[in-house]
Amino acid sequence: MPVRQLPEIIVNRIAAGEVVERPASVVKELVENAIDAGSSRIDIFSDGGGRRKIVIADDGSGMTAADLALAVDRHATSKLDDEDLLQIRTLGFRGEALPSIGAVAKLSITTRHASEPHAWTLRVEGGDKTPIAPAALSQGTRVEVADLFFATPARLKFLKTDRTEAEAIREVVRRLAMARPDIAFTLAGEERAPVTWAAALPGAPGQLIRLGDILGADFRANAIEVRAEREGVVVEGFAASPALTKANALGQYLFVNGRPVRDKLILGAVRAAYSDYLPRDRHPVVALFVTLDSREVDANVHPAKTEVRFRNAGLVRALIVHALKDGLAREGRRTAANSAGSVISTFRPASMPPANWDWRASPSYPVGGSAAPSFAERAQAAFDVGAPSADIRPTEVTPDLLDRPLGAARTQIHETYIVSQTRDGLIVVDQHAAHERIVYERLKASLEANGVQRQILLIPDIVEMDEATVERLVARGEELAKFGLVIESFGPGAVAVRETPSLLGKTDAGGLLRDLAEHMAEWDEALPLERRLMHVAATMACHGSVRAGRVLKPEEMNALLREMEATPNSGQCNHGRPTYVELTLTDIEKLFGRR
């Protein structure tokens, strides 16, 4: 078969396959055009998941009759100069959206420019263009798209249900609305009540209002403002505290020069920044806006313009990690779970105990004997734990302690949780999780300073394990030594532990080494050294922390609370779980139906 030139209508339909994947793609392209036109209000309507009808109306600059005639031709655009491809400042620039839509649907455009005496309208059906004609419209542009993919019916087979396609449209509009809080958006149709996001003032306060309207009150309540700038690159936005997480990464909204994007580099940076705060199966909620010189980023990677390529990707990633870590650390204990609402929802009215119930027989009632001894003394511990603990009974509270953020310890329950009293409520602390974070932060600080102090064992601990595990540990010996854990091979199937971190005091060297070996087996060889060291620190902190089931004296409990107040990120343990839960008096009164 000889080589021949394809007809223009076929070329447009092929191009439409890249630009118009589904109804949401149409909405994205048309709303971006409205934003580029300087609109202050954009109304979106869809029906049948966008298959039957899509309408986008704006109050932007509109088009003249001459511009309208050219707008539906391929690669006709007002947004790009002859040699300006490396300095793209608009959301759209290819000049492909309108001709691509017109090639596969019934497209109608009505527009009015301020210089024109009246509006003009133009129709394109399956690539066939009609002459422009006068029309009635006060201002801006109104675009209607009907019977999407009627000219390419095979594409209809790949669309999802109307409900799914409508949700995809909603998500596209949400992302564009996040990027431009100064523009009012209305989304209607699909037999739903219209949703309106009013225009907000520019700057961070307006941005947070818009994000709260879209992402919900929980995000607004947990939002932490972040910002960092270096070498002309600015990262700003809001990140939710670790108290608000999702089971997937769908709550991460990323924008580059105002353009919503999906970028693995940025997603990886977000994950790295939260690595000290969240479990592996939870994901943070963030809205980050990266602004940089348009010459430093390539938006012309894909026809849909959802992917970008940075000239200095390392700088962007480092800046995102720095901005998020700085914001989370700055908030300190506020990153703890503000879970009073969820706690209250789990309570149910209690039934009265049977009449013959004997409170003396309750397992929680101490019957004779002394309390168990406290955990072993540690060389740099936050509090003295050398003597046996006293009986657990409510302690005297001094007024000044009630004013401290974590209040005054009143008692310990189930030998695991510390109950403290504040001026306006109470706090329940998980003693192991809290101390684990304290030890972890100390290990990190020591590593960044002069290294972790070691204690030499008079008699080395000999730990037996399989040869593969021994090889794995010895191979990482240099990294372990940075944390004060000095080991060496002791014949086949054994490791000698000669020094341990002073922070850990007396520790189970065998258990620690086995846990470290298990984690090392999961490491990817490409995992950066810093990440590997943090994994080691987290494992050591877990082993060096006070365990559940250890009875604490009142002064020990208060010392732990004070250490938490002075420790960064003490709201979560190293695995991302909350270290304490706070209940205000209002919350408690709700439990008893007083409010």
Swiss-Prot record:
> Which Pfam family is an annotated match for this chain, by its short name?
HATPase_c_3
Give all cystine bridges in this chain.
Answer: none
Biological processes, Gene Ontology terms: mismatch repair
Q: Which InterPro entries has this protein been placed in? A: DNA_mismatch_repair_CS, DNA_mismatch_repair_MutL, DNA_mismatch_S5_2-like, HATPase_C_sf, MutL/Mlh/PMS, MutL/Mlh/Pms-like, MutL_C, MutL_C_dimsub
Instruction: State if Secreted is listed as a keyword.
Output: no
UniProt GO MF annotations: ATP binding; ATP hydrolysis activity; ATP-dependent DNA damage sensor activity; mismatched DNA binding
Q: Does the keyword DNA damage apply?
A: yes
| Listed GO CC annotations | mismatch repair complex
The UniProt keywords, alphabetically, are: DNA damage, DNA repair
What the record says about family reads:
Belongs to the DNA mismatch repair MutL/HexB family.
- Primary role: This protein is involved in the repair of mismatches in DNA. It is required for dam-dependent methyl-directed DNA mismatch repair. May act as a 'molecular matchmaker', a protein that promotes the formation of a stable complex between two or more DNA-binding proteins in an ATP-dependent manner without itself being part of a final effector complex.
Q: What is this protein called?
A: DNA mismatch repair protein MutL
